Amino acid sequence: MSKAKFERNKPHVNVGTIGHVDHGKTTLTAALTRVCHEVWGTGESRAFDQIDNAPEERARGITIATSHVEYDSPTRHYAHVDCPGHADYVKNMITGAAQMDGAILVCSAADGPMPQTREHILLSRQVGVPFIVVFLNKADMVDDEELLELVEMEVRDLLSQYDFPGDDTPIITGSALMALEGKDDNEMGTTAVKKLVEALDDYIPEPERAIDQPFLMPIEDVFSISGRGTVVTGRVERGIIKVGDEVEIVGIRDTTKTTCTGVEMFRKLLDEGRAGENVGVLLRGTKRDDVERGQVLCVPGSIKPHTKFECEVYVLSKEEGGRHTPFFKGYRPQFYFRTTDVTGSCELPEGVEMVMPGDNVKMTVTLIAPIAMEDGLRFAIREGGRTVGAGVVAKIIE
């Protein structure tokens, strides 16, 4: 089978379904592929069972079962992730294995918000999912118009509780199963899912591409080249670095400023290095000992070093090669940010005495050295080089 050519002419947006078990996330995922294919003739229709037996992937040493599907509206290409189990969502969102530009919260109109509805909204807030659109599913099972309105109000309240704009969030009511079966009684099937895609188009802004963001490169290695000066190497995470640009070196020690006097790739000199490329950057007047792995090179003022932050963490289970025993407050592992480990101590939330392998928990971490960080930065938790957890910065404290 020849692979279909990937069209790059449409903006690409990453989304995913979230919500309580059995509220219809996977059915809706299948319905989205079917409706886009039928209404706009784009993409391929995928069956429920093609999505439901999600393959397991490994991200940062953690096994996650995830299904990836794609579909197109007339103006956009969507890449959509769906997970079979609650634990997979927790891992997926914390590791950032599937970064979402927006989430589709699926909530059964017959049951209303349930524990995982709340937990997934909280996780979305903690890991920095910027936008949520709601699909009130199974509306064909609810005869009472007032009940639908009540559930809608509950969902809006829940979103507002976690600092999402509950009052302005688009909520589409319908039945994913009807849409999947090609039915559309009372516009609850195909029409509702088409409306959902239109809401995604309108409500989730086009994500800013990595190349348009301010330049940042984690430093992996440092060399001195006689007669030329100091070269730092790494993969450009975002933005563009041009010869002559002023840059800052941030993290671990005091922030310093310098100028890029050369960019090279595969021993060839370039005018610039771009997001995604592995480059060497020559720094003016910087000594070999002034820079180290774990610092970042960036646009001056674009990112600051911090030592204390609140984070959401997933602790690997024993089966995943994690710890065999719980940890308690005052636990001091290494936190691996981008290219280096920094020791830090953990404070647990009030009322939480210990954290078991396989749990997810919110905690406050204090590092022994500052790291260039911003909300949404992912990290691994390690003990002597072995990964025992994954986390994401939810809020910087100092």
Curated annotation (Swiss-Prot):
It comes from the Bacteria. Keywords: Cytoplasm, Elongation factor, GTP-binding, Hydrolase, Magnesium, Metal-binding, Nucleotide-binding, Protein biosynthesis. Residues 175-177 are annotated as: G5. Its EC number is 3.6.5.3. Residues 137-140 are annotated as: G4. PANTHER family: ELONGATION FACTOR TU, MITOCHONDRIAL, ELONGATION FACTOR TU-RELATED. This is Elongation factor Tu. It comes from Marinobacter nauticus (strain ATCC 700491 / DSM 11845 / VT8) (Marinobacter aquaeolei). The gene is tuf.
